[in-house]
Design a protein with these regions (language model features):
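Conserved core of the sugar-phosphate nucleotidyltransferase
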Residues: 67, 131-226, 233
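Short aromatic/basic micro-patch
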Residues: 27, 130, 208, 259-260
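Short beta-strand segments
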Residues: 9-10, 123-125, 150-153, 187, ...
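Conserved catalytic-core motifs of eukaryotic protein kinase domains, centered on the activation segment
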Residues: 17-21
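Conserved N-terminal catalytic core of the sugar/cofactor nucleotidyltransferase
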Residues: 1-5, 9, 13, 27, ...
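Left-handed beta-helix
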Residues: 227-351
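A structural signal for short hydrophobic beta-strand segments in well-ordered beta-sheet cores
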Residues: 25, 163-166, 248
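Residues that scaffold the ATP/ADP-binding catalytic core of kinase and kinase-like folds
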Residues: 16, 186, 217, 260, ...
Length: 351
């Protein structure tokens, strides 16, 4: 059985969002980015995950507007509240304050005193909301005794830390289940050579590492880099220097590990999420969507046979459609069950 401690990095101020709302609380499909990540982490404990997890807890490292973040995730206040809190209701949440933002290595180190050496640590980013439980499960299963990291190959890798592998980059495989070549280090963009900057495989920020080793590596970090920060990624090279090898899994869909730093990236993630939801409804439930690109699901939708949804329909909360339901264009439907053979005309607002 696996004892898993998840560390979620949620301390970033997010200045590029130009917002009074903490970055990690900006919504994707009506749900804060942080909540999406917590839902994915909590799902690892379910029977459907395939992981034999004996114990799971989540450590949220917060900094900027910490009380606002805690209140929203705890479900104790206002506009960002929602039924999604039930996703992690039975998982211990532990809040860790990072008073100064001194880098990702420093952020993770704040949480480690509350994690036993025998645990496996899964590190997630609160501004990477599309990560799926299935990918996290594969990452955990593929980890060597020294750990694993999640990577992605990008045509334009500017701004990301480049992954250095044994034997170079010529044998990169894109199939997440088949990538097993070992990693020697990660070099951040600002510290990379010109040759390293040409590499296309980058670090997603998601890692799975043994707690005891992680504590040892973090104690040896320094700030000898352009940013003057403690880089969590330096642990990869430290492991390699000790003769330990980390595996790396390369995801096939870059959107799954897309980070959000500004409103344009938030909009990209929103559309990617909606496309994923629409495809699932069409393939798994047989829903007909007049235009999958003009449909928004901000909650859950269950449909019967032969249902049709026209363009620019917004579904909020928990909605069920009986058999043969037809929804006209420009409708909003919230927390509603619609009986079989019903027809909803254009511009209806149903709550």
């Amino acid at each position: 059985p696996l004892a898993l401690s998840v560390i979620v990095l949620a301390a970033s101020e997010g200045k590029r969002m130009r917002s009074a709302i903490p970055k990690v609380l900006h919504p994707v499909a009506g749900k804060p980015m942080l909540a999406h990540v917590l839902t994915a982490a909590a799902a690892l404990k379910s029977a459907a995950s395939g992981l034999a997890i004996d114990y799971l807890d989540i450590h949220i490292v917060y900094g900027h507007a910490g009380e606002q973040v805690r209140a929203a995730v705890g479900g104790t206040v206002g506009v960002l509240d929602g039924s999604w809190h039930a996703d992690w209701a039975d998982i211990p949440l532990k809040w860790v304050h990072q008073a100064e933002q001194l880098g990702t290595g420093h952020a993770v180190a704040q949480a480690l005193p509350g994690i036993p050496d025998t645990h496996t640590v899964l590190i997630l980013c609160a501004d990477v909301p599309l990560i799926t439980p299935a990918t996290l499960e594969r990452l955990i299963n593929a980890a060597t005794p020294s750990g694993a990291l999640l990577t992605v190959s990008l045509e334009n890798p500017h701004g990301y830390g480049r992954v250095l592998r044994e034997g170079g980059q010529d044998d990169i495989q894109d199939d997440i289940q088949d990538t097993h070549s070992l990693v020697t280090g990660i070099v951040e963009e600002r510290d990379a050579t010109e040759a390293q900057r040409r590499l296309k495989e980058v670090n997603s920020g998601v890692m799975c590492l043994p707690a005891a080793s992680l504590k040892r590596w973090l104690s040896g970090l320094n700030t000898n880099n352009v940013q003057g920060e403690y880089y969590l990624t330096d642990c990869v090279a430290m492991a390699h220097q000790e003769g330990q090898s980390l595996s790396a899994l390369c995801v096939t869909d870059p959107a799954e590990v897309q980070g959000v730093n500004d409103r344009a990236q938030l909009a990209f993630v929103e559309r990617a999420y909606q496309a994923r939801q629409a495809e699932g409804l069409m393939r798994e439930q047989g829903l007909t969507l007049a235009d999958p690109g003009r449909f928004d699901l901000r909650g859950s939708l269950r449909v019967g046979q032969d249902c049709f949804v026209d363009v620019d329909v917004i579904i909020e909360g928990d909605v069920t459609l009986g058999d043969g339901v037809r929804i006209g264009p420009f409708c909003r439907i919230q927390d509603t069950h619609i009986e079989s053979a019903s027809q909803v005309h254009a511009h209806c607002d149903i709550q």
